Structures are given as C-alpha cells and as structure tokens.
Amino acid sequence: MERPALLQNGEHGAVGSLETKTTTRLMPKPFSIESLIATQTPATVSASASIAASPPSPPEDHEQEQEQELSARAMVASSALGLTQFPLYNPWLHGYFAQNHERLTHLIAGGGCYLGSPVGNPFAGKEPSHPHPPPPHALDKSPLPHPLDTRFLPFNASAAAAAASAATPTDLSYRRLAELMNQDYVHNLSVNARLQHMAVAGRLQEDHPSHSLMHLQEPMLLQANPFSPAKSVSHSPVEPTLDVGVDEDYECSGDSSSDISLTLSPMPRNCNRELDKSRNGAYTNSDSEDCSDDEGAHSHHDASGLGGKDSQGNGSGSSSSKSRRRRTAFTSEQLLELEREFHAKKYLSLTERSQIATSLKLSEVQVKIWFQNRRAKWKRVKAGLTSHGLGRNGSASGTKIVVPIPVHVNRFAVRSQHQQLEKMCLSGPKPDLRKKLSTEAMSGFEKFNGGGLGGSAPSSSTASVGAGSVGMGLALGIGVTTPLSLGRSIY
C-alpha cells in the first residue's frame, strides 16, 4: 500500500496487462471503490492491447491514439494516487482499510502498472524509463477522457489542491477535471471529503462563472451516504451547509438527515402555539366550571368586595395564564335583577339559570359564578351573626344586613329596589317564600319573636319585629316593618 511499491509495480506496464485482466475479474460484485476501478481497468487494458496489435496507421491517427492512451494512464495514475492518500482520520476509512487490506493491496499491485511511464514519453508503455509519478501540471494539460468513463474514480483532495495551485484561470483541461470531480462518484465519499471538495470547487467558481455548482452540490448534500456514520453528519466542521434546523440533541442517520430535518424543524414552534391555544381555550372553558364549591370563592370575594363582579371565579386558570382576565362589570340593572333572584331562590336550576342569563344578556357561567359568590357571602354573614349571639340576645339591630354596593351602581335605584322587595314581601311574596313557619324550622331569632307573640299567630308572615326586648306588649306597638320572610331569606 506504500507509494514505492506502487512505483516498482508500475515499471511492468505493458507486460502485466493480461494479469491485470485476470485479477480484476476475481474482485467481488458488491458496490465498492475497488469494484468500480476494476470495471474501468479492463477498458484501458483493451485499449493498450489494441494499440499494440493494430497495424501501422497514419501519423495523425497514431498521435491521437497516443494522446488517448496517455490520458487514460494519467487518470489511472491519479486514481491510484488517490487511493494511497485517503484521509485516514476518517472513521469510515479506518475501518474500511482494516477490513479490506488484502484486497486493496492486491488491486493496487495489479492495477498500478500504469504509474511507471511519464506522460511526456510517447513510448512509455513499451520502454519504461522513469519510475516517478507524473507532476500535477502534466495531468492538467493532458486531454481528459469523457466524463462518463471516469466518473467513478475516487477523489483526492490534496491532488486537486495541488492542481488548483498549478493551473491557470484559462485552463480548459482543469475545468474539465473539476467537472469530473463533481460527478456522482462523490456520493461514495465521506462528508469530510465532500466538504474539502466543495472548498476546492469554490475556487473554481471564480474562474468559471458560467458553470454553476449549486445544482451539483444540492443533490450531493441531500442524497444519502450509506457508508458515512451519523456523527459525521451532525458534527462536521462546515456544519451550516448541512444544518437545516435539526435540534442539537437530536441525532439522525445519514440516509434520513435531510428529510427529517426539513420536516421536524418548524415542528416545536407550531406545537408550542397549538399547545398555548388549547391551554388558553381549556382555561377559558373550564375555569368557571371548576369552582362548583361555594366555599372556593371566598378569596375572590375578599379581594373584590363584591363577589358578583368577578365572573371567572377560580384562581388556578388566571395564575396559569400570562395575563389576568378582566372582571365582568355588571350594570345596575343586572345587579338588581340578580339580587332579586337571589332573595327569591338561593340555588338555581339549569333552566332558571339559562332564563336569567338570556334576560340579562349574560352567559350562564357568569350567572353561576355570581350566585356562588353571593352564597359564599351569605354564609359568612350568617355565620358571623350566629357567632356574635345576636339570635340569643334578640337585638333588632342584627336583623338589618348591610350589603356593600359597588361605586358604579346607583344607590337610589338600590334603595327603591329594596323598598319594592319589602312591599312585595308584605303584600304577597313568591310561592317559594310562602312557607309555614314550624317550630323545628325556626331559627333562634324567629323562635324568640314567636314566643313574644304569645303563640297567637305563629304562622303569620307579617308579624313585626320588636325594636328591643322591653316587653311583649311593646313588640307589637313599636314594630319595624321588616318581615320575617325577608329576614329568613337573607339568613
């Protein structure tokens, strides 16, 4: 595998042609570099044999055949030189030479016979004299064969760089050599060799602007390399040409890197948007449904003063979302209607809730949350009254429950509404409020008033509440027009 061995074997150029033909037939059939070179070597051998066996021809034909033979030998020499100077730091090449050392040695020893003749000697095939390899400029100035015949020859980056340094900008043969380098044999090389080849081809693009290399580089980068490992794709030194948006932690195989990267790169952004949309939609739809417990709305009521202003209820959705949702600003008419319905009935059915929401131009969720907050406040007030012992003392001041009114609500409208409620309760309330007061269902305050009446009218809903605990006679005389039914509905 060393170069001196190649040069010594190259001295027997014309003698070893038949041996080359027999040895190359023994090479295996799978797709590899040596099988491709073996398919090209018999063509050159047959060409040299035809030159030796052909009768004398005119000088022009003889010179043309000599030029063809010299060009073929030059390409074989460059191919063998490329085999000896592969970049051995590549992990694929290291394992490749370790497995196929004997086959490559046999191939180079048999097929390197064309290295012995210098390009300038016309009779080099018959009388080998100089065992030195041809210089790079001689390879450039010699006419090259058709690109289809030599497209599978391996690429040598160092030889191409030397040829690029020695060639002039107007050298047509160097352009043809670069075109040969861009053929589809480059798919057999590793990614590092491809990137070196692209660096050499970038110098050529300045000298040859009409021939664009973009259409040659795109299939070369997008097509898969079956021998290249995955790490050479994801960690190559000139990564921006191959990087199309794959994450750094994501590693893919060489045959699917381009397809997967093109389809997976916009995926995280789209997924994040969809997740945010679904998350916000879920919070919007399920915030109000989660707070079914009456006691769960206490914190919102404490923060707002009036729980009916907050329409969304639960704090888990608002804390998860980035921006806090606005509170629903109920109008005075809506608040009055809601208060009236609450005095009439503490718990609404689905039909009643939908009817109230339709009449007030609110959503059913807003009506449900308002009723939950209002019930929570009603329970707190009731618990506060019982803890202070107002029912046991029987003080009349405990019967008046002051509900804080929001600033934007008209206070006169609220007062008139309360007066209407009192009149309605005195004249005849709704059927829900017309309940017979039994001793078991009475609270302590109502039991006290019922005892004060002497049991004369225990079932009357229009009995007056005494201003103080002075006596039983004063309870009827100095009465305040607060019906028991309204007090019972507030409690």
From Swiss-Prot:
PANTHER family the UniProt entry points to: HOMEOBOX PROTEIN GBX (PTHR24334), HOMEOBOX PROTEIN UNPLUGGED (PTHR24334:SF0)
Subcellular location: Nucleus
Organism of origin: Drosophila pseudoobscura pseudoobscura (Fruit fly)
InterPro entries in the record: GBX-1/2, HD, HD_metazoa, Homeobox_CS, Homeodomain-like_sf
Encoding gene, per UniProt annotation: unpg
Biased composition (Polar residues): 254-264
Lineage summary: Eukaryota, Metazoa, Ecdysozoa, Arthropoda, Hexapoda
SUPFAM superfamilies: Homeodomain-like
GO-annotated molecular function: DNA-binding transcription factor activity; DNA-binding transcription factor activity, RNA polymerase II-specific; RNA polymerase II transcription regulatory region sequence-specific DNA binding
Region annotation Disordered: where it falls in the sequence: 1-23, 46-69, 124-146, 227-329
Family matches, as PROSITE patterns: HOMEOBOX_1 (PS00027), HOMEOBOX_2 (PS50071)
General function of this protein: Plays a regulatory role in neural branching of the tracheae: segment-specific aspects of these neural branching patterns appear to be generated by homeotic regulation of expression.
Name of this protein: Homeobox protein unplugged
GO biological process: brain development; regulation of DNA-templated transcription; regulation of nervous system development
Gly residues composition-biased segments: 305-316
CDD domains: homeodomain
Chief location bin: nucleus
Keywords assigned: DNA-binding, Homeobox, Nucleus, Transcription, Transcription regulation
A cellular component term, taken from the record's GO annotations: nucleus
